[in-house]
């Protein structure tokens, strides 16, 4: 199946989720994520703020701040994405494509070992990922390739196999619920 068709099908499944289903899966993923060695060992989390029916990440990012970890979330500048440090997850506003992002343009996060949480539409057991089509994470990780990466998704987003392209960068770990 081509990426356009796959993206459309997954978006339709996400739109069909009830708020209760999103909350239940997000709570399970939060607990699972906070129990991982990746989380426990990370000093810095490059997270993301949820958009539409994405996994709700705010509780995990708030816990990371409470646990003394540094947290940054992405902000888009044209076709590039940079992570901006955030101490307060309320200091955000709709940005690129109405996705929540920091109001401030700085300070720009600069931890090459930060754990990067990645959204996406579809994943497979080999870590292949189909994103939303902007290429923001692929470009970021091509420029900063040493980050450990972890994707969060719903069970229907986990597929047996995805066709990928040369520029697609796989994730190290995928958690789903």
Where are these regions (language model features)?
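Conserved phosphate- and dinucleotide-binding cores of soluble alpha/beta proteins
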Residues: 79-177
């Amino acid at each position: 199946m081509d990426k356009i068709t796959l993206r459309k099908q997954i978006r339709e499944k996400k739109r069909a989720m009830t708020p209760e289903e999103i909350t239940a899966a997000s709570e399970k993923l939060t607990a699972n994520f906070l129990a991982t060695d990746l989380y426990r060992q990370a000093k810095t989390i490059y997270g993301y703020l949820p958009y539409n029916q994405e996994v709700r990440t705010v509780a995990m990012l708030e816990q990371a701040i409470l646990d003394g970890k540094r947290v940054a979330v992405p902000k888009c500048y044209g076709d590039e994405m940079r992570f901006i440090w955030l101490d307060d997850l309320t200091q955000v506003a709709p940005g690129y494509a109405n996705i929540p992002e920091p109001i401030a343009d700085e300070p720009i996060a600069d931890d090459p070992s930060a754990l990067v949480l990645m959204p996406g539409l579809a994943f497979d057991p080999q870590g292949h990922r189909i994103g939303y089509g902007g290429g923001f994470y692929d470009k970021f990780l091509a420029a900063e390739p040493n980050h450990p990466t972890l994707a969060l998704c719903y069970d229907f987003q986990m597929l047996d196999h995805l066709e990928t392209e040369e520029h697609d960068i796989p994730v190290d770990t995928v958690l789903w619920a």
